[in-house]
């Protein structure tokens, strides 16, 4: 199993022209059978999205298969944000490019390489983002996305800190159901209650919770440029 975080089409931080192009590389000596699922994200106060059917394809030995606009092409979705899970035998390497149309021509966006299960935050550890930024709707914004890859429930608390390491605002408790994806737009502001050019966010799974993936999407609201940040996992 591997997971692509922060994929989307026609919605999300990059706007209505967002699309995701996926590439799959099979370095093995035999063909690989690949099954891809898309987990539609919801807002923290929203209901879990309906499950989308998976898609299965073959990646020939030693070849790359490119899937442009994969969220629409494979899953028929016009407007959705979420995560993709990739199951393959033998294993493939997956990489996505998430882009949107640029007013000056071309496209801007970010790359998202597939992650393995050891990149999750589990109970006793925490996922730390030292690059959280919410500096105004027209300057910089950061969106937090949490993915539960398991069949059990997850419960996490999101905490905010200033540049001096002092806790700010009120911790945000979030329930992330089985195979669920939750979005928190302007995440630092949502927790801290105020914006900041530089801040820190921590995602802390509760005792007994399932492990979760976390990703932070930071976007320059003037240029449209963005990056998808994975956290530093502080072990227990």
Regions found by a protein language model. Give the residues of each.
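Gly/Pro-rich, tryptophan- and cysteine-flecked surface segments typical
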Residues: 1-236
């Amino acid at each position: 199993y591997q997971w692509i975080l922060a994929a989307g089409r026609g919605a999300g931080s990059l706007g209505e022209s967002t699309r995701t192009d996926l590439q799959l590389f099979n370095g093995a000596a035999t063909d690989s059978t690949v099954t891809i699922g898309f987990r539609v994200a919801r807002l923290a106060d929203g209901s879990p999205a309906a499950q989308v059917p998976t898609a299965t394809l073959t990646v020939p030995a030693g070849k790359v298969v490119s899937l442009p606009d994969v969220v629409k092409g494979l899953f028929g979705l016009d407007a959705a944000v979420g995560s993709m899970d990739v199951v393959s035998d033998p294993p493939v390497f997956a990489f996505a490019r998430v882009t949107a149309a640029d007013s000056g021509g071309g496209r801007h966006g970010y790359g998202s390489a597939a992650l393995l299960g050891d990149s999750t935050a589990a109970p006793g550890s925490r996922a730390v983002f030292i690059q959280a930024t919410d500096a105004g709707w027209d300057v910089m914004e950061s969106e937090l996305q949490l993915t539960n890859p398991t069949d059990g429930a997850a419960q996490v608390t999101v905490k905010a800190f200033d540049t001096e390491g002092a806790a700010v605002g009120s911790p945000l408790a979030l329930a992330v159901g089985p195979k669920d994806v939750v979005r928190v737009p302007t995440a630092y502001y949502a927790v801290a209650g105020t914006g900041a050019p530089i801040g820190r966010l921590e995602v802390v799974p509760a005792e007994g919770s399932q492990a979760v993936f976390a990703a932070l999407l930071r976007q320059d609201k003037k240029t449209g440029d963005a990056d998808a940040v994975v956290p530093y996992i502080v072990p227990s």
